[in-house]
Structure formats: C-alpha cells, structure tokens
C-alpha cells in the first residue's frame, strides 16, 4: 500500500513564519514537529507575507498554493488569519467575505482547509474589536464545514501568553508560539489531517 502524501500549504503573516521565536519554528513548525509521519508523508510550504490582511491573502493564496499542490497528493490549506484588518479599517463584513471567498474556492477544488484565528494582543480596546473579528472568522469557517482554531478566547487572559508578549514587544516568543501550537494540536489538527493523535501530545 502506498504511503499517503499530504501537501500542506499555509498562508498568513509574520506570526505564521515564527518571527521572534528563538527556535525559529513558530507555531506551525512546532505543530509539524509533533505530527507523526510513520503512516503519512507531509510536505509543508509556509507562504507568509508580513503585515497582511484578509484582502491580500484572498488575492494571492490560490496562485501561490496552486504551484505547490499536485493532483497526485492530498492537498491541505492552513489559513492563518491576522489582525491586520483592524489597522486597515476593513469592515468585519468585508473580512468575512474575503475569508468566505477563499474557503468557497478551496471547497470547489476539494481542498480541505483549516482556519487559524488571530491571537489577542495586550491592548484592551483592540482586543475588543479583535473578538468580533475572530468570531466572524469562526462563523464563516463553521458554516462551510472547514476546521477553525480559536486563538483569541483561550489566550486573552492567559498569564503566560500575556507575559510573553510583554517581554517581546507585543509579539510572541518561544513560550507564546508554544501555546499557539498546543491549541492547534488540540483543536482538531490530527483529525483534520486524518491521522491518529499521539498519546504523548
């Protein structure tokens, strides 16, 4: 029996790329490192661009992931949504539409997607706005039956997360990325990939 091959492309901003992580793994690299490969071959591609909002991601994702995917492999898409739309004054309705367009196109191409919501920062006013945006992304994903990982709610008042941000100029460091990876791994990652969850995770 041939070994399953999954091509896994991830689009997002600098958090996806692990900027500020002393181990240079970020949450995505950590999640992959904890993913068993005895029954599956995973070929991963990080397609990150700094300071991107939903509009930019929706405009570039298909061309970029299309160059990595193959008809001979199982193709998976990770969409690491960002908080940049808050700075660009993009309405929540528009942000929803941008993600919906990505997921609708992915569904038409039989690409299974996982949406990872944006994590909270330290600014209370911004977090209040981000709460609505994160919830909107979750609603769009669930309506289209794609996986969604809520980063906002569990990290909002997490002491270690907030301390890590405070020590790293508002960005996650090693501890913060570890927390993000843990959430991804325990919110459907293995089921989404169709592989058994290791007992030690």
Where do the PLM segments sit?
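Glycine-rich phosphate-binding loop signature in dinucleotide/nucleotide-binding domains
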Residues: 67-74, 109-110, 191-193
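Structural motif
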Residues: 7, 75-78, 112
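Catalytic His-Asp segment of secreted/periplasmic serine-dependent ester chemistry enzymes
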Residues: 120-201
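Serine-esterase "nucleophile elbow" of acetyl-processing enzymes
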Residues: 1-50, 62-72
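Cell-envelope and extracellular/periplasmic
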Residues: 15, 47-52, 79-87, 142
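A general structural detector for well-ordered alpha-helical segments in enzyme core domains, enriched
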Residues: 27, 31, 64, 95-102, ...
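Active-site segments of SGNH/GDSL-like serine hydrolases
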Residues: 80-86, 102-134
């Amino acid at each position: 029996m041939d070994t399953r091959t999954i091509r896994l492309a991830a689009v997002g901003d600098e958090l996806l790329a692990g900027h500020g992580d002393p181990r240079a793994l970020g949450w995505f690299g950590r999640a992959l490192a904890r993913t068993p490969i005895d029954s599956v071959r995973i070929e991963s591609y990080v397609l990150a661009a700094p300071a991107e909002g939903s509009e930019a991601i929706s405009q570039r994702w298909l061309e970029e992931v299309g160059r990595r995917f193959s008809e001979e492999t199982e193709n998976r898409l990770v969409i690491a949504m960002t908080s940049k739309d808050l700075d660009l004054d993009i309405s929540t309705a528009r942000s929803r539409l941008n993600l919906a367009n990505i997921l609708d196109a992915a569904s038409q191409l039989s690409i299974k997607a996982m949406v990872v919501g944006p994590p909270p920062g330290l600014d209370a006013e911004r977090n209040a706005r981000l709460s609505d945006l994160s919830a909107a992304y979750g609603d769009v994903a669930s309506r289209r039956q794609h996986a969604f990982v809520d980063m906002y709610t569990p990290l909002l008042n997490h002491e270690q997360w907030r301390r890590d941000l405070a020590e790293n100029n508002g960005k996650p460091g090693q501890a913060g990325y570890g927390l993000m990876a843990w959430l991804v791994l325990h919110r459907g990652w293995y089921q989404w990939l169709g592989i058994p969850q290791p007992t030690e995770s």
